[in-house]
Amino acid sequence: MKKIIIMVLTILTISEIVMADMCFHKIIITKVCDGDTIKGIVDGKEVPIRLTGIDCYETSKINRAYKQAYLNKISIEEVVKRGIQSKRILCKFLENRPNVKVKFTDTDRYDRKVGILYADNININEYMLQQGGCLVYEYKQ
């Protein structure tokens, strides 16, 4: 009886590990659009991915950048400068890291997948926050 219980617990543990790993998708990064958006090949298709929980400054003078400047009381030039810096931080971090995975959490109103990126078991979304490359963002559909 004891052996059966141990075997059942072992099987349950292994299936939990397998199921958890199934939530993650291997991704080949094809483009870093900015500090919080990338493109990558997942399951044979290139998809745009928005990193969940973070919002980086824009890298060009688009309408959203002017809004960021106004809300944060900084110049549009400073917004773009910080946006470019965020993009560089993400590019540098991803350099020479072939084992990148993504865990999808949603799809946004622009039809981008929303998710958490991991490289070498490091949560890249959190890393970007720690580096000061972005602000906390609560995703709204």
Descriptions of predicted regions:
Residues I5-V8, E16-Q141:
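Small beta-barrel nucleic-acid-binding modules, primarily SNase/OB-fold domains
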